[in-house]
């Protein structure tokens, strides 16, 4: 499980993928954690099956390798459990969740 401190440090680790699985409308209402990429939960399975160039075109970042460090975040820490399950079922082995997710981030950042 990732901590607030680890998530805050993600911009210093370009090899780490911080994936926010909230819907786009939620991000527009609340904002997002810096360095995160948005892949809504209902798109995640399909997104992780895209080829590298299609993934980069859609999400603006190269597709994670199966062993790339991935941290999933959402609003309150529930959807990340499903995201973790999806990624692991596709062979991604270095996956953790940020249980505090946006709610903890916003509180600690004073947002």
UniProtKB/Swiss-Prot annotation:
Highest taxon in the source lineage: Eukaryota
Residue ranges occupied by any Rhodanese domain in the UniProt entry: 12-110
A UniProt-annotated Pfam family: Rhodanese
Record keywords, A-Z: Stress response
UniProt-listed PANTHER family: THIOSULFATE SULFURTRANSFERASE RDL2, MITOCHONDRIAL-RELATED, THIOSULFATE SULFURTRANSFERASE_RHODANESE-LIKE DOMAIN-CONTAINING PROTEIN 3
Protein name as annotated: Rhodanese domain-containing protein CG4456
């Amino acid at each position: 499980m990732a901590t607030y401190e680890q998530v805050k440090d993600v911009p210093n680790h370009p090899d780490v993928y911080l994936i926010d699985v909230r819907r786009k409308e939620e991000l527009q209402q609340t904002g997002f954690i810096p360095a995160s990429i948005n892949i809504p939960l209902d798109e995640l399975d399909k997104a992780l099956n895209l080829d590298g160039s299609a993934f980069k075109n859609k999400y603006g970042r190269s597709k994670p390798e199966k062993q790339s460090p991935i941290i999933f975040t959402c609003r309150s820490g529930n959807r990340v459990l499903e995201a973790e399950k999806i990624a692991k079922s596709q062979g991604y082995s270095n996956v953790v969740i940020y249980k505090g997710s946006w709610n903890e981030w916003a509180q600690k950042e004073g947002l």
